Amino acid sequence: MPRTHAIEDYRNFGIMAHIDAGKTTTTERILYYTGKSHKIGEVHEGAATMDWMEQEQERGITITSAATTCFWRDKRLNIIDTPGHVDFTIEVERSLRVLDGAVCVLDGNQGVEPQTETVWRQADKYDVPRVVFVNKMDKIGADFFKCVADIIGRVAGKPVCLQLPIGAESSFKGVIDLIKMKAIVWSGEALGANFSEEEIPADLADQAVEYRTKMIEACVELDDDAMTAYLDGVEPDEETLRKLVRKAVQLRAFHPVLCGSAFKNKGVQPLLDAVVDYLPSPADRGEIKGLDFKTEEEVVRHPTDSDPFSMLAFKIMDDPHVGTITFCRVYSGKVESGANVINSSRDKKERVGRMLLMHANNREDVKEAFAGDIVALAGLKDTRTGDTLCDPKDAVILEKMEFPEPVIEIAVEPKSKADQEKLGIALSKLAAEDPSFRVSTDQESGQTILRGMGELHLDIKVDILRRTYKVDANIGQPQVAYREKLTRRQEIDYTHKKQTGGTGQFARVKFVVEPNEPGAGFAFESKIVGGAVPKEYIPGVEKGLNSVLGAGVLAGFPVVDVKVELIDGAYHDVDSSALAFEIASRAAFREALQKGGSVLLEPVMKVEVVSPEEYTGSVIGDLNSRRGQIQGQDMRGNANVINAMVPLANMFGYVNQLRSFSQGRANFTMQFDHYEEVPRGEADKVIAKYA
């Protein structure tokens, strides 16, 4: 089956936003207008096509990023719908990694919100070109120009308006297209309502000229010929302007801003035109860098069908009909179903079974996938999120994705033996699907511990366990993921000796143990010269050290950011073994942690509270009582925005407290920011509770 669309005609893009900015509704409208969805799904009716998990339809939020293919003006659009809730930023990271462009949706009333900032930063990290769509222009309080100012003030973006709204709130009826200098007016709010091009209303003509001039000046800066002509009094024509806006988006020189109301069916078609006209194709994004599988030297892959095949797995889902499906982006070459490939990230062979094109949760079998395609593969055995699949004869490892550490945990106890078995299977599937969700067993209590990015994240996992996998279990209270850290350098010389006749045990190790840089993790280095500890015992040393990392000396929390050097040791020809060195290393490391002034670290959250002004005093007083540090305040519309850093331990149940003293009018978002040392008095309480 040959390629149906040239790679230049692909647009792989995502729709990113803060929760409730109308992202899923915008996607639904896109699917409707591109002819994919016959009946439009409304989020508040729980029928959105892209939100197909039960939990999403109930909560009205998007949890998993579904991938969908549709067509507009003969271009092939692969859309990744991403969640906007802060507990699911991992999904956004994963999607951005495989996108070529993005549409950032803002709520016309709220402007740039905390999660918008997070997503914008993630898009910066992966160099994703983007256009901005100011949605909900029909809402009370919608303010297009405030949103544009927010893009500059809150995310240091460079907005350039390509459209201006005609009317606002209930009188919003269309947009001014600053490239054509025409008004686009919709004749009603019905689905697929027709629109017409008209002359710009007289009362908006001056404003249109002012913003068109700003747009042209931003564009001609990118092209010497256009700049020269403009200085001579010749404005660029429509086609030149579109080319220059496209160039600006690809170079991230500025961010074009459009507006509309997806819910009221206004502004979606021009947004689709902008996706086609301005967002890059895979060919525009150019080569992708990777590492040679054998030599680990940098190599490149080009987005052509003739290059060696390579693809990146960016999402794994469990599908009730097909089993495990792995969403992949093909970066180079082509692959047929039935092909044998290698997972170069894990050095495992895989066979490509069924290949599916996904439309939310409908699927279509395809026999072949080409550079630029986003496909779902059924039946892969060993592939995880972030792994590379490629041609075994020319293997490459595409860049790894980095995933954040979980900050909150709960214990789960199955109610029966049957539940125990179901729980094991379910958790291994959930952990494979979501790298920010970790599962472990508490060595002391034998309980299963689930770790995640926030209360909602874990709530939804528990919900999936109960509903999808029918596991009946007791769920503990959420606990903070504390960490332990050494503060002083220690030199420890330790000998493990057990010689009581017969084969004994003997191992001596001498370590320098010192704090590592924050976030640098654990580092081990052997500085042994002259064979004081034979090479075959070094893995035993590492194993002993690793066994302590999982449970520190203060209260059994994981140890972070520590550097260990093995500088000397001794062995016995008969009595030494890897096990003896493992035992010696474990004891020496524990001694170093005890003597090295270990302290407790706790996750500190970045909290933003949006509250009517009359409750500001109560909000600040309450945050202070939670050991919060107020970082600043500003106004957003008629609400006060309070930013603070607060330890996670003091944020449990905050949502109910905030609702009660603000009569439900204040809301908040929080996300993990950093770990810091727990004050002495608090630390003593935590140690007494857990030790």
Swiss-Prot record:
Q: Which Gene3D superfamilies match?
A: 3.30.230.10, 3.30.70.240, Elongation Factor G (Translational Gtpase), domain 3, P-loop containing nucleotide triphosphate hydrolases, Translation factors
Q: Which residues bind GTP?
A: 17-24, 81-85, 135-138
Alphabetical keyword list: Cytoplasm, Elongation factor, GTP-binding, Nucleotide-binding, Protein biosynthesis
Q: Where in the cell is it found?
A: Cytoplasm
Residue ranges of every copy of the tr-type G domain listed in the record: 8-283
| PROSITE patterns documented for this protein | G_TR_1, G_TR_2
GO MF annotations for this entry?
Answer: GTP binding; GTPase activity; translation elongation factor activity
Q: What is its main location?
A: cytoplasm
Q: Which GO terms describe its cellular component?
A: cytoplasm
InterPro entries in the cross-refs: EF-G-like_DII, EFG_II, EFG_III, EFG_III/V, EFG_IV, EFG_V, EFG_V-like, G_TR_CS
Q: A GO BP term, please?
A: ribosome disassembly
Report the family membership: Belongs to the TRAFAC class translation factor GTPase superfamily. Classic translation factor GTPase family. EF-G/EF-2 subfamily.
Family annotation (PANTHER family): RIBOSOME-RELEASING FACTOR 2, MITOCHONDRIAL, TRANSLATION ELONGATION FACTOR G-RELATED
What this chain does, per the entry, is described as: Catalyzes the GTP-dependent ribosomal translocation step during translation elongation. During this step, the ribosome changes from the pre-translocational (PRE) to the post-translocational (POST) state as the newly formed A-site-bound peptidyl-tRNA and P-site-bound deacylated tRNA move to the P and E sites, respectively. Catalyzes the coordinated movement of the two tRNA molecules, the mRNA and conformational changes in the ribosome.
Task: Specify the protein name.
Answer: Elongation factor G
Q: Which gene encodes it?
A: fusA
